[in-house]
C-alpha cells in the first residue's frame, strides 16, 4: 500500500534540502536521512495540509535492480512499513525521512530489510 498524500515527501527542493542538510544513518542495505520539517520548502498546495506530520520518501535507483518490478516491490514494501510505523508515532513527530536503498538491497529478504529500517528509525529517534 502506498503512503497517504499527507505523508509523502514531494518536490526537488525538499529532496535537495534533505540530501544536503539531513542527518544520515547508515545500514548495510540502506541510508536513512532525517531532518526537521520545513513547510516553506513544500509547494503551495501541500504547504498547509498537515505540514507538521512526518513525511517520507523512498529512493531506489536502477543500480539496485534493472527491473522496475523489483524496484517497485521494494518501494511498496518500505512505504507500507513506514506508514504502519510512523502513523503510531507521537504527534510531535515533525520530521522528513528519506530512505535510499543500496544495490545489495535487492538480494536481501523482506524481514531483514524491515528490521534494518526499524533499527535506523530507532537510531534517528523516530520510534519509541
UniProtKB/Swiss-Prot annotation:
EC code(s) of this entry: 3.1.26.5
Disulfide bridge map: none
InterPro entries the record matches: Ribosomal_Su5_D2-typ_SF, Ribsml_uS5_D2-typ_fold_subgr, RNase_P
SUPFAM superfamilies reported for this sequence: Ribosomal protein S5 domain 2-like
The entry's keywords: Endonuclease, Hydrolase, Nuclease, RNA-binding, tRNA processing
Chemical reaction(s) catalysed: Endonucleolytic cleavage of RNA, removing 5'-extranucleotides from tRNA precursor
GO molecular function, one term: tRNA binding
Enzyme class, UniProt record, top EC level: hydrolase
GO biological process, one term: tRNA 5'-leader removal
Superkingdom assignment: Bacteria
Membership in a protein family: Belongs to the RnpA family.
HAMAP family: RNase_P
Subunit and interaction comment: Consists of a catalytic RNA component (M1 or rnpB) and a protein subunit.
Function: RNaseP catalyzes the removal of the 5'-leader sequence from pre-tRNA to produce the mature 5'-terminus. It can also cleave other RNA substrates such as 4.5S RNA. The protein component plays an auxiliary but essential role in vivo by binding to the 5'-leader sequence and broadening the substrate specificity of the ribozyme.
The protein, known as: Ribonuclease P protein component
Protein encoded by which gene: rnpA
